[in-house]
C-alpha cells in the first residue's frame, strides 16, 4: 500500500466550515498534516494531536489527545462538532479553488484552506 500524503502537507489548513455550518469569526481551528504521519492542530479552543494515513484519496484520521481548556459554550460546541467529525473522515479532495474537503461516509464535509 503506497502512502500519498503529499497534497495534505505544507502548512496549516484553516477550518472554514464543519458539516454545513461556518465557523465562528476570529476563531482559529486548523489542522497540520506532518510528513511523519502526525496530525496536529487546534479544534477551536483546545489543541489536538493524532495520526493521519492516506492512500490515493482515502484518509484516516486518528485523534490521540486534546488539551482540556474550557471556553465559551459556542466555542465548545463548534469544537465538539469538529472533534466528532474528524475521526469519521474517509476521503478527501482538494477542489479547483484549493479548498480541502474532508468527507465522512455519511456525506458530512469539513472544509479548510491554507
Model-based region annotation:
Residues 1-114:
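Lipid interaction determinants
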Amino acid at each position: 500500500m503506497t502512502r500519498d500524503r503529499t497534497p495534505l502537507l505544507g502548512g496549516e489548513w484553516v477550518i472554514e466550515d464543519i458539516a454545513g455550518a461556518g465557523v465562528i469569526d476570529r476563531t482559529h481551528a486548523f489542522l497540520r498534516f506532518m510528513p511523519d504521519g502526525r496530525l496536529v492542530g487546534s479544534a477551536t479552543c483546545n489543541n489536538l494531536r493524532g495520526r493521519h494515513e492516506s492512500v490515493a484519496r482515502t484518509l484516516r484520521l486518528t485523534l490521540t489527545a486534546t488539551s482540556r481548556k474550557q471556553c465559551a459554550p459556542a466555542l465548545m460546541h463548534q469544537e465538539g462538532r469538529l472533534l466528532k467529525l474528524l475521526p469519521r473522515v474517509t476521503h478527501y479532495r482538494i477542489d479547483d479553488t484549493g479548498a480541502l474537503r474532508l468527507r465522512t461516509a455519511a456525506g458530512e464535509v469539513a472544509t479548510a484552506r491554507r
